[in-house]
């Protein structure tokens, strides 16, 4: 393992360092084991970055293993989306993707071994009866009447379960541990259940499937995982993890360690709530840009680097806390500020007519793609007698603090000329639709010759060459920091989380998407092209604003 001065540290890395110094492992091996029954979200990204990051930093390896032990809820669609997300984040798993179902024969053999040792039994108790017999945190459980069934009978009954002789829920295989244990997971947990369902990997071969707690530890051992990293809700289950490994004939003895899961403000991360958002049409789908899924973040314009950086910043601890959404937004803002080329777009347009500019004349102006990075080069932008500006950038009258265009006042058009507003044209409702101006032809790239000061600068697009576009302004999905704490979390949905505007974009953007996947539309925010775009009508998603507007709201 190569030490680096800048490598982050945390309690898990300290454990690994100690294990290596004590000679416990020749190489570090981790795994990321999602269940293929949904789409990954930002919380999974934390685990991905931790497991793959450790493997990378310690010159080890990380497996991608699908915990596919519940065929009724799993699908190959989720398998493919998870692979795509992990790859998109920039990580490579060791060898082929693995599946818990690869080990079904071995898992079944280990279950038989436990029966033979008198450490597992087939229970025909109804599920509600079994639940009642488990007891509570304050009261010990009661032994099942099937707990002392002899080994030979249990082997026969488990064979019948495996052969499909029993219906779902009719019986299950339980580990024989301790019904008086203070830890509920140790009170004879179910390790196999009957399930007559087609499996996306094994087809119809099996009608009994192992439970997660039985599968997890054995799969780790089979793969030679050295450090099995889980979130804190599995802390008590570590006792069951160790019990299984200690009571079967397997050489490898992996160890489980727990860290706090990600809790992020202004969103929800529980699968149940995310499913509800989709099924009740509060969002357009799993990749809705307001969703915390990796697919949603990607569609919104988040870069892999920004998500990895976010996971680095939040760190790894055992403390359960709420992370500010502004931290995630700061990561993408920093990334795009440095790497996104600039362009201009007008989202709420009014026309500006330059009356002393020759009709039919066009110019090609040169604009920098990034004010602080000359290596990004320049671009050509058209300029003619009519341009579009933002409606909010013009007022008929204003105080001195307003540094944009006002009647009888001057302003500079970004990368172009100084113009002066002379008169306006309005619609029947009194809204300004057109501003008539004059321009100073000697101010291209320089200040007025007579020394007058023009302080304001506004963006614009050339009316002759601009492309009509749709702009989707996404914001936080909820208007309270912790929507999960609400009695009905959907009541906290932000009604202004999506605003759609029809405007104009600088020519030439579609077909020339930058490497980072986004632009900074000057003075407006960072935008990416949405999948709904067409050549005739591009659609741009706002990834994030130029600054944190929610910070002001909270003050």
Swiss-Prot record:
Enzyme class (EC, first level): ligase
Motif stretch ('KMSKS' region): 268-272
Binding site for L-glutamine: 67, 212
Reactions it catalyzes: tRNA(Gln) + L-glutamine + ATP = L-glutaminyl-tRNA(Gln) + AMP + diphosphate
GO biological process: glutaminyl-tRNA aminoacylation; glutamyl-tRNA aminoacylation
Extent of motif 'HIGH' region: 34-44
Gene3D superfamilies tied to this protein: Glutamyl-trna Synthetase, Domain 2 (1.10.1160.10), Glutamyl-tRNA Synthetase, Domain 3 (3.90.800.10), HUPs (3.40.50.620), Ribosomal Protein L25, Chain P (2.40.240.10)
GO molecular function per UniProt: ATP binding; glutamine-tRNA ligase activity
NCBIfam families in the record: glnS (TIGR00440), PRK14703.1 (NF011291)
Name of protein: Glutamine--tRNA ligase
């Amino acid at each position: 393992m190569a030490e680096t001065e800048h490598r982050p540290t945390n309690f898990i890395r300290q454990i690994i360092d100690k294990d290596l110094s004590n000679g416990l492992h020749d190489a570090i091996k981790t795994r990321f084991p999602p269940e293929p029954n949904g789409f990954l979200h930002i919380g999974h990204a934390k685990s991905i970055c931790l497991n793959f990051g450790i493997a990378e930093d310690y010159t080890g390896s990380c497996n991608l293993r699908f915990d596919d032990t519940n065929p009724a809820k799993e699908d190959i669609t989720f398998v493919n989306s998870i692979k795509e997300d992990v790859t998109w984040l920039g990580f490579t798993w060791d060898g082929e993707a693995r599946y818990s179902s690869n080990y079904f024969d071995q898992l079944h053999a280990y279950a038989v071994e436990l029966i033979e040792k008198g450490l597992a039994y087939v229970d025909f108790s109804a599920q509600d009866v079994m639940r009642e017999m488990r007891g509570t945190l304050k009261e010990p459980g009661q032994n099942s009447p099937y707990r002392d069934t002899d080994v030979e009978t249990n082997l026969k009954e488990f064979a019948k379960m495996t052969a499909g002789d029993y219906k779902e829920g009719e019986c299950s295989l339980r580990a024989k541990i301790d019904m008086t244990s203070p830890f509920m997971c140790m009170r004879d947990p179910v390790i196999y259940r009957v399930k007559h369902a087609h499996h996306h990997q094994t087809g119809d071969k099996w009608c009994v499937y192992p439970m997660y707690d039985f599968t997890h530890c054995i799969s780790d051992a089979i793969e030679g995982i050295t450090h099995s990293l889980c979130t804190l809700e599995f802390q008590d289950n570590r006792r069951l993890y160790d019990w299984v490994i200690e009571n079967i004939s397997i050489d490898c003895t992996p160890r489980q360690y727990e860290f706090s899961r990600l809790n992020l403000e202004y969103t929800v991360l529980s699968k149940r709530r995310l499913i509800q958002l989709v099924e009740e049409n509060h969002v357009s789908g799993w990749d809705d840009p307001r969703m915390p899924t990796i697919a949603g973040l990607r569609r919104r314009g988040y870069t892999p680097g920004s998500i990895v950086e976010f996971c680095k910043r939040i760190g790894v601890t055992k403390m359960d806390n709420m992370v500010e959404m502004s931290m995630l937004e700061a990561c993408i803002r920093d990334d795009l500020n440095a790497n996104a080329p600039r362009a201009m777009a007008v989202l709420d347009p009014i026309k500006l007519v330059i009356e002393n500019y020759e009709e039919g004349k066009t110019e090609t102006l040169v604009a920098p793609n990034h004010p602080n990075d000359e290596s990004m080069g320049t671009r050509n932008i058209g300029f003619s007698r009519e341009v579009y500006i933002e409606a909010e950038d013009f007022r008929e009258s204003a105080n001195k603090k307003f540094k944009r265009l006002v009647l009888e006042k001057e302003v500079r058009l970004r990368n172009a000329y100084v113009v002066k507003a002379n008169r306006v044209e309005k619609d029947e409702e009194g809204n300004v639709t057109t501003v008539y101006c004059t321009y100073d032809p000697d101010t291209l790239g320089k200040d007025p010759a007579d020394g007058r000061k023009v302080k304001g600068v506004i963006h614009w697009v050339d009316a002759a060459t601009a492309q009509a576009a749709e702009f989707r302004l996404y914001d936080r999905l909820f208007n309270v920091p912790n929507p999960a704490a609400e009695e009905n979390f959907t009541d906290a949905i932000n009604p202004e989380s999506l605003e759609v505007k029809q405007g104009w974009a600088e020519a030439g953007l579609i077909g020339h998407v930058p490497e980072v996947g986004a632009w900074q539309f000057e003075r407006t925010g960072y935008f990416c092209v949405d999948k709904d775009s067409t050549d005739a009508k591009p659609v741009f998603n706002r990834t994030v604003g130029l600054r944190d507007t929610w910070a002001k709201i909270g003050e």
